Regions:
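Catalytic cores of the polymerase beta-like nucleotidyltransferase superfamily
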Residues: 1-416
Length: 416
């Protein structure tokens, strides 16, 4: 792996600003890891010998956020981009398995890197020096090993979320855990009970979207069972669990789709798992749509697809059909259904009430009473369009409504 990194101009300018003021500064952590893996970093983080007040002085001409100042972190807006800059520090006395009770600023980069979670995240870089890698993170990346910096027992007790982060990185980068890290995961799995559900949701989502999620979900089935008791019975059935893991790995790496594949065995009970992880109402809705669709057969009939699109939405049905390509035994039927779905989209075939060439006022005009009967009539007209009994044309729809609207003894139903 290379020892030099091409830095964005703005990142280099921040390093130069520190150097002009007489401080050490490096890009650090995940951005180094990503570059070595030939990936584009989502952000660039900095560490420096400057203390928080000195960081603020260096960037007095910039917008800054000092919410994390007590922990040594200042956010600096440079060229309209926010960057996180943290003073070299050591940590001690983790009281809640998350935050250090005591932070001590230091001028030692080595001490700062020593506090980090994994060797692959404990590297720093400066273009005049190269990659600083005191814990052989680059070698672990080459060997595809996730290894804690120092004693993994200590690292996991400092922040229990690191247990899931280890599995997430292994899933994302096709890695194995070092033996010591692996043993500590199983030994300290109970510590996950103390982690905020929202934080766990983020890590589980990234784990499920990793390229090696099937391997990790099977290898660490005990962790999954501890986190999600509703899956324990399924996990005990090894062939069934293996099939679910493979299904998750083969659908598109989109969070809602991966979660739906993961939860599909639970059916309606999936809502409990999603609520446990504090998913937003909208995310729960999107995932449950797919879970419910997964309980239904794939049919290549246009009317069946139109009904599903009306009930669950166009996007959900499209995602569901793609999921079936990896799990449905009759691939020919799935391919036919996908072709039919694409034709519906291309031809703009009606599948919702708002797509119909008629509205409630039109029904009022022909004598249908205001109230629930209007909605019922519109839904029945839509079903007639979906079934092909009437074309989606205003005159035909009005004629059909007049001919089929029930007598006054059943004012909310149409006669067929």
């Amino acid at each position: 792996m290379k020892n030099s990194i091409s830095l964005p101009e703005s990142v280099q300018q921040i390093l130069d600003r520190f150097q002009q003021h007489g401080y050490e500064a490096y890009v650090v952590g995940g951005c180094i890891r990503d570059v070595l893996l030939h990936q584009t970093p989502s952000d660039w983080d900095f560490c420096t010998s400057a203390n928080p007040d000195e960081i603020l002085q260096c960037f007095a001409d910039c917008k800054t956020i000092a919410v994390g100042k007590a922990y040594g972190t200042i956010c600096v807006n440079w060229k309209s981009v926010w960057y996180e800059i943290t003073t070299f520090r050591t940590e001690s006395e983790y009281a809640d398995y998350r935050r250090p009770s005591q932070v001590t600023f230091t001028t030692s980069l080595y001490e700062d890197l020593k506090r980090r979670d994994f060797t692959i995240n404990a590297m720093a870089y400066h273009p005049q020096i190269g990659i600083l890698d005191p814990f052989d993170g680059k070698l672990d990346l080459e060997k595809r090993i996730i290894r804690c910096v120092g004693n993994p027992e200590d690292r996991f007790q400092e922040d229990a979320l690191r247990i899931l982060r280890a599995l997430r990185f292994a899933s994302a980068y096709a890695c194995s855990l070092s033996q010591e890290t692996n043993d500590a995961v199983f030994h300290h799995v109970n510590l996950l009970d103390s982690v905020a559900k929202e934080r766990m949701c983020v890590e589980w989502t990234k784990l499920l979207c990793g390229s090696s999620c099937a391997v990790i979900l099977q290898r660490y089935a005990a962790v999954v069972a501890h986190q999600f008791p509703t899956l324990q019975e399924t996990i005990q059935n090894v062939p069934e669990w293996q099939a679910i893991c493979e299904r998750v790995a083969h659908v598109l790496p989109i969070p809602s789709i991966r979660w739906a594949a993961f939860c599909s065995v639970l059916g309606e009970n999936a809502i409990g798992l999603l609520q446990q992880l504090r998913f937003s109402k909208q995310d729960q809705k999107n995932i449950l749509r797919l879970v419910r669709l997964c309980q239904q057969p794939v049919l290549a009939e246009q009317s069946d697809l139109l009904r599903k699109m009306h009930q669950y939405g166009k996007e959900a049905v499209g995602d569901w059909l793609q999921m079936q390509l990896t799990s449905f035994s009759n691939q020919e039927t799935v391919l036919q259904a996908i072709a039919q779905y694409k034709k519906i989209i291309a031809d703009q075939i009606c599948y919702t009430i708002k797509d119909m060439q008629i509205c409630g006022n039109d029904l009022l005009a022909i004598g249908i009473p205001n109230g629930p009967a209007i909605g019922t009539c519109l839904n029945q007209l839509l079903e007639a369009v979906i079934c092909g009994r009437v074309h989606n044309q205003r005159s035909e729809l009005l004629q059909y409504a007049e001919a089929h609207y029930a007598s006054s003894d059943t004012p909310n139903l149409m006669k067929y």
